[in-house]
Amino acid sequence: VAIGVSQSGRSEDVRLTLEGLKEGGALTVALTNHGDSPMAQLADHHLELRAGEEKAVAATKTFTAQMMALALLVAHWSGDEDLLAGLRAVPAAIRGMLGQSEQIARAALRFTHAPEAWVLGRGLSLAVAQEVSLKLKETSYVATQTYSSAEFQHGPIAALEPGTPVLLFATSDATLDTNRQVLAR
C-alpha cells in the first residue's frame, strides 16, 4: 500500500511518486483536500479530508487533518483500540487547549524577539517537530533549526545560546528517556 499525501492533490513530486508505485503494482491511496485533484483521480482509493479551503500559507488546518486521518488508518488497520480511544479524545483535548489561549499567548511571547529557535523531537515526534519548525519560519519569520533530540545532545547543543527558545516534542514511548535527558541539560 502506498499513500500519497497532498493538501491540494496537485503536488507534482508526490503525484509522480504515487504514479510510479502504482505502475509497479502497489495499491495506491491519495489523501487530499480535493476530490477532483490529479492525485485523487490517479489513486486506486481516495480519502478526502474535507478540511475546507486552506487560506493560511502554513496550512496548519490541513496538516492536522492529514495527521489525524493517517493515525486513524493505522489504528483501524492494526486494530489498536487504545489508539482509537486516544484519537476519539482529540477533539475534546483541542477544545481544552483553545480554552487556554491566554496561557498560550504568554508562552508565544518568548518568540516575539527571538532571532532563532530550536525545535526537537525523536521517533514519531520528529516529523511533527520538523513541521512545527517550518510553520514557525513561514508565519513568524523566525530562523529555526530542527534536530532529533538524541542527535542534539551530540554537538548541536554546544551552539545553543542562552535565552534561545527550545521546543521539545515528546511522546510517551521508548524515546521519552532521551527527551528527559535533553531537558535536564
Spell out what each predicted region is.
Residues 96-103, 144-154, 175:
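A general structural motif
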